[in-house]
């Protein structure tokens, strides 16, 4: 059984579950994967609580322990910034936790040439803590939007998705995407799990899967989860 620690935010956790189901293509109810979604929406905000490391760790760990007690074979966390706490969570949890940034990196190796520019759209917390740099700096050059675009467009789009204002979020994120394309990025990581919802708003699942520009961590993590579930 797959354990999903969600609630960061709720829309992002549901987006992951939706992609997990669509990837599976079960012909009957019984053909779909068993999973537990713990929508733990009371976890303190990650980007604004980086300095309260232990407080956030405790809440995340409680979520992982809940899933472990419910007999989950492994755990996934559809939140990029939460992976700042990944190492301590894995040390204190008795089942594997799949690392989202690592899976995105392993996917990128297959899609991009060494030293390629890869754009990263993410929370300021994800950028500051380097959860993607930890992997990508080995083979790629990560590129970010300038500060004004980060503040006016990326942060705004993330907030709008959390508020359920998807059309507004889709409009807000466009200048950030265009700026990274102008910087000749080969791919763009949607490094906050709210952002695929904004980018792919109202698009079919087939178009999401075939995107040549964007790397969707939720979709990549869902693929990795299905492989591990079936192994």
Residue ranges of model-derived segments:
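Non-catalytic structural scaffold of enzyme domains
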Residues: 1-231
